[in-house]
C-alpha cells in the first residue's frame, strides 16, 4: 500500500447485523483490539428483494465512510453468494426459486441477475477504494466456491465484471485449505486465501502447494461459532449440531476447534451454544501471525441477524440431513459480544495483536448506555392470524398443487394452505410431503398438531373435511448442496394414496408488518397474551433511561418482534436463545410501539410450545391433540410452567 507492505489485521463486522447508531462504537472497539482493517459481506437478498427493486444500497457506502473515519481499512465481499449464516446465503429467493441448481454457475439467466446486482452495488464501493482516498483495500470474488462448485468460467466471469465495473484494488478468493477446494475455488492471477480455525502451519502449507508465491492470509479465522435452535451442549440435537460444524468447519479438520463446554454464560443472548476457550483461540491467532500472514478474525463482532434473516444448515458431514435453523443472535462467541462489550477473548487477542500494530493500541471507547430500568410492555390489542393475513398478506392463489414460497413471492414469513378432502370417505392419514419447515394445522377449524418433519402425517381425517396448514420458513439453507431449496409444501398432500388437488394458498411476508399504514388499518380486538396472531402494545422508557436492552417474552412460543418499527428477529421457546437484543438507538424516551407476531400460540398457564408435535411425544397419533390438552390447539389448564406474561424490556 503506497509502495510499502501492509499486514492486514482485520476483523469481520457485518454492517447489516449492527444498528447504524452503533457503527462508530463497534469500529472503535475493533481498533482498540489492535486491528487495522474491517471486513464485511454484502447480502444481495437484503438489498434487492424483488428483481430490479433495490433498497438501502447507500447504507453500505455510509458504513465504508464510517470505516474510513475510524482510521481502518476495509475488505468488501459482495457475493453474489456469501454464506454468513444468512438466509439463502445471500441469494434472493426470486433467483434460486426458478433457477434451482443452475445458480452459482455460468448459466446465462443467473449471470444476468448477478450482473445486475454487481452493477447496482459497486457504485458504493468503487469510489471508496484506497487508490482513490477511501478505505477499501480488497474485494472478494464469490465466496468459498470450492466448497460448492467447479465452474471456473463462472469465477472468471465474476472477476471480469468486477474489473469492468471499476474495481482496481486486489481481487481475491477464499476457500478451505483442502486441495479440491482450492482447485475449485481459486482464480488464476488472483490472490488466494484460506479459512480455518486452527492449524495455521498446515493450512498455509496446503495453500503454498497451489500458490508458491504471494501473500499468506487467513480470510476467516473462526474464533467462535454460531448456535442453532433446539440445540446446545448436551441437548438432544448436540451430536447433530457437532456433525454439521465438523462438516462445514471440518474442511480443515476443524471438528475439535470449537469447544462445547457450555461456558458462554452471559455472552450474547444465547447463553448456550458453540463457544471457544479464549486462551485456545489466542494461541491459534498467534500461530497465524508467527507464519508472517495477514488475518481476518471471523467474527470480531458478530451482532444480530435482525429481521428474521438468520439462515439454516443441514446436519451431517455433507450437509444433507435434518434442518438446523440458526438462532437470531450472531454473537459467535466473538471478542466483542452482541451488545458491544469486550470479553475475555478481546483482551487475549489485544495482547497477541499489540506487537504487530503500527503504534500504540488505543483504549476501548466508553461503554454504550444501558436501559436504566426494566419496563413491561402494555399490550393494547390483538389481531388473529386470519385478520393479519387478510390485511397484510398477498393475494390468494388457486393451484392444482401447493405453490412454494418462491412461487408466491415470500422470502421470510408464512403461507396458509387451504384444501378440501372430498367425501364421504373413510378416515385415512393425510400425508404432507416436503414440509419446509413447520406447519400449524387445522381440520374443520379444530387445531391439529404441529408438523415439523419433511415427511409429515396428519390424521386420520374422514371426508368431507376442510384442512388448513400454516407453513413457516425457519430460514433457508446458507451452506452446502441444499442451498436454494424451496420452502412451503414442496411435495403435495395425499389422502391415503390420492393427491389432493385444488389448493388455495396465501402468503404473508414478514416485511409487510413493517408497513405502519397497513398495520394501522387492521382491526385489533382485546388483548389475548400468547395467542396466535399480531399483538400490539407500548413500552414506556422514562427520560434519561434510553439504552441497550433485551426483550423477554415469558411463556410465548415462537414468532417475531418489532420495537419502534425496527425488526428484532425471531424468538422461540425451544432455545437456547432466551431473549432478543434491543439496540438502544431503537428506543426513545416515552412510549415505544411493540408488535409481536406469535405464530403458534400458548395458553395461559403454559410456557412451552402451545401445541403438541405430530412427530414427538404428547400426541395420540389421531391428528388431534392428545392427552393433556384441551383441544384448543394450546396446552390446557393444569400444565406445568409459568403463565404467559407480557413482554418486558430488561437492562
Task: Tell what function each PLM region has.
Residues 1-37:
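N-terminal carbohydrate-binding accessory modules
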Residues 8-19, 42-60, 96-115, 140-152, ...:
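The substrate-binding groove and active-site-proximal loops of carbohydrate-active enzymes
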Residues 23-87, 159-164:
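Aromatic-lined substrate-binding rim segments of carbohydrate-active enzymes
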Residues 51-58, 69, 80-104, 155, ...:
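Aromatic- and acidic-residue-enriched segments that line the glycan-binding/catalytic groove
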Residues 68, 195-242, 271-337, 341-348, ...:
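Catalytic-core region of carbohydrate-active enzymes that cleave or remodel glycosidic bonds
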Residues 109-187:
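Active-site neighborhood of glycoside hydrolase catalytic domains
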Residues 427-442, 540-563, 571-572, 594-597:
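Aromatic-lined ligand-binding clefts that engage carbohydrates, nucleic acids, or primary amines
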Residues 473-506, 601-610, 636-651:
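Glycine/proline-rich low-complexity spacer/linker segments in large multi-domain proteins
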Amino acid at each position: 500500500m503506497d509502495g510499502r507492505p501492509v499486514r492486514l489485521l482485520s476483523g469481520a463486522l457485518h454492517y447489516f447485523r449492527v444498528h447504524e447508531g452503533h457503527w462508530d462504537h463497534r469500529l472503535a472497539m475493533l481498533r482498540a483490539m489492535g486491528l487495522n482493517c474491517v471486513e464485511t459481506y454484502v447480502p444481495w437478498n437484503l438489498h434487492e428483494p424483488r428483481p430490479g427493486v433495490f433498497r438501502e444500497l447507500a447504507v453500505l457506502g455510509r458504513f465504508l465512510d464510517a470505516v474510513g473515519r475510524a482510521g481502518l481499512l476495509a475488505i468488501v465481499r459482495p457475493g453474489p453468494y456469501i454464506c454468513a449464516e444468512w438466509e439463502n446465503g445471500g441469494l434472493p429467493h426470486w433467483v434460486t426459486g426458478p433457477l434451482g441448481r443452475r445458480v452459482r454457475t455460468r448459466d446465462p439467466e443467473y449471470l444476468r441477475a448477478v450482473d445486475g446486482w454487481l452493477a447496482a452495488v459497486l457504485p458504493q464501493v468503487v469510489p471508496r477504494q484506497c487508490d482513490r482516498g477511501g478505505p477499501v483495500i480488497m474485494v472478494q470474488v464469490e465466496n468459498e466456491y470450492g466448497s460448492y462448485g467447479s465452474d471456473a468460467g463462472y469465477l472468471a466471469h465474476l472477476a471480469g465484471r468486477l474489473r469492468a465495473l471499476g474495481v482496481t484494488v486486489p481481487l481475491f478468493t477464499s476457500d478451505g485449505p483442502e486441495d479440491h477446494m482450492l482447485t475449485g475455488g481459486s482464480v488464476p492471477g488472483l490472490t488466494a486465501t484460506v479459512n480455518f480455525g486452527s492449524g495455521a502451519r498446515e493450512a498455509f502449507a496446503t495453500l503454498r502447494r497451489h500458490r508458491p508465491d504471494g501473500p499468506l492470509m487467513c480470510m476467516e479465522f473462526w474464533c467462535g461459532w454460531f448456535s442453532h435452535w433446539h440445540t446446545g451442549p448436551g441437548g438432544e440435537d448436540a451430536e447433530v449440531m457437532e456433525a454439521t460444524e465438523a462438516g462445514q468447519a471440518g474442511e480443515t479438520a476443524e471438528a475439535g476447534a470449537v469447544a462445547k463446554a457450555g461456558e458462554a454464560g452471559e455472552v450474547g443472548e444465547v447463553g448456550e451454544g458453540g463457544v471457544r476457550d479464549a486462551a485456545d483461540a489466542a494461541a491459534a491467532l498467534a500461530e497465524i501471525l508467527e507464519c508472517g500472514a495477514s488475518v481476518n478474525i471471523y467474527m470480531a463482532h458478530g451482532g444480530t441477524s435482525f429481521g428474521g434473516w438468520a439462515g439454516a444448515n443441514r446436519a451431517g458431514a455433507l450437509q444433507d440431513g435434518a434442518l438446523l435453523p440458526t438462532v437470531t443472535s450472531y454473537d459467535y462467541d466473538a471478542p466483542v459480544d452482541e451488545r458491544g462489550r469486550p470479553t475475555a477473548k478481546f483482551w487475549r487477542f489485544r495482547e497477541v495483536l499489540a506487537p504487530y500494530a503500527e503504534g500504540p493500541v488505543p483504549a476501548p471507547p466508553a461503554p454504550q448506555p444501558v436501559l436504566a430500568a426494566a419496563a413491561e410492555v402494555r399490550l393494547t390489542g390483538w389481531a388473529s392470524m386470519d385478520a393479519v393475513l387478510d390485511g397484510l398478506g398477498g393475494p390468494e392463489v388457486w393451484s392444482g398443487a401447493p405453490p412454494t414460497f418462491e412461487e408466491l413471492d415470500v422470502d421470510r414469513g408464512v403461507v396458509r394452505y387451504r384444501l378440501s378432502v372430498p367425501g364421504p370417505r373413510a378416515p385415512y392419514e393425510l400425508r404432507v410431503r416436503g414440509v419446509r419447515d413447520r406447519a400449524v394445522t387445522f381440520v374443520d377449524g379444530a387445531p391439529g398438531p404441529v408438523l415439523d418433519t419433511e415427511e409429515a402425517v396428519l390424521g386420520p381425517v374422514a371426508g368431507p373435511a376442510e384442512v388448513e396448514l400454516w407453513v413457516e420458513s425457519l430460514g433457508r439453507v446458507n451452506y452446502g448442496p441444499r442451498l436454494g431449496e424451496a420452502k412451503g409444501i414442496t411435495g403435495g398432500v395425499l389422502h391415503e394414496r390420492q393427491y389432493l388437488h385444488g389448493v388455495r394458498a396465501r402468503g404473508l411476508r414478514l416485511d409487510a408488518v413493517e408497513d405502519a399504514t397497513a398495520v394501522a388499518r387492521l382491526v385489533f380486538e382485546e388483548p389475548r397474551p400468547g395467542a396466535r396472531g399480531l399483538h400490539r402494545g407500548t413500552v414506556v422508557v422514562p427520560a434519561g433511561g434510553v439504552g441497550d436492552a433485551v426483550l423477554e417474552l415469558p411463556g410465548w412460543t415462537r414468532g417475531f418482534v418489532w420495537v419502534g418499527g425496527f425488526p428484532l428477529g425471531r424468538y422461540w421457546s425451544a432455545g437456547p436463545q432466551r431473549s432478543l437484543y434491543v439496540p438502544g438507538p431503537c428506543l426513545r424516551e416515552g412510549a415505544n410501539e411493540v408488535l409481536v407476531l406469535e405464530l403458534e400460540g400458548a395458553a395461559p398457564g403454559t410456557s412451552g410450545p402451545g401445541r403438541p408435535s405430530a412427530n414427538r411425544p404428547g400426541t395420540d397419533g389421531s391428528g388431534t391433540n392428545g392427552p393433556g390438552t384441551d383441544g384448543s390447539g394450546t396446552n390446557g389448564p393444569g400444565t406445568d410452567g409459568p403463565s404467559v406474561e407480557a413482554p418486558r424490556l430488561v437492562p
